[in-house]
Amino acid sequence: MSLLTEVETPTRSEWGCRCNDSSDPLVAAASIIGILHLILWILDRLFFKCIYRRFKYGLKRGPSTEGVPESMREEYRQKQQSAVDVDDGHFVNIELE
């Protein structure tokens, strides 16, 4: 006798979802949260460049200069510019033969 004949296989009627008739609020809340999560994930994947670019560059502002004398502001600008100038020296030109 084969083991396959003794294995109980579910009938087609048992494969259906049994939670369709359920009025449990937890099931409804989980379904709503799942659908919202899916929608947000799709939007994130579609617009991630716009969203994260906005966060990275759009929301960045320099430190507040309110109440700071103009001479100190100019000194700060010069330091920032010199830092940028130093970074420009790190680029390496590679020429292929």
From Swiss-Prot:
The chain crosses the membrane at residues 23-43. Residues 1-22 are virion surface. Gene3D superfamilies: 6.10.250.1640. Residues 60-84 are annotated as: Disordered. The keyword Transferase does not apply. It comes from the Viruses. GO terms for cellular component: host cell plasma membrane; membrane; virion membrane. The M2 protein from most influenza A strains is inhibited by amantadine and rimantadine, resulting in viral uncoating incapacity. Emergence of amantadine-resistant variants is usually rapid. Glycans are attached at residue 20. The modification Phosphoserine is found at residues 64, 82. The keyword Lipoprotein applies. Coiled coil: none annotated. Its main location: virion. GO terms for molecular function: monoatomic ion channel activity; proton transmembrane transporter activity. Belongs to the influenza viruses matrix protein M2 family. Cytoplasmic tail plays an important role in virion assembly and morphogenesis. Forms a proton-selective ion channel that is necessary for the efficient release of the viral genome during virus entry. After attaching to the cell surface, the virion enters the cell by endocytosis. Acidification of the endosome triggers M2 ion channel activity. Homotetramer; composed of two disulfide-linked dimers held together by non-covalent interactions. May interact with matrix protein 1. This is Matrix protein 2. It comes from Influenza A virus (strain A/Swine/Wisconsin/1/1961 H1N1). The lineage of its organism: Viruses, Riboviria, Orthornavirae, Negarnaviricota, Polyploviricotina.
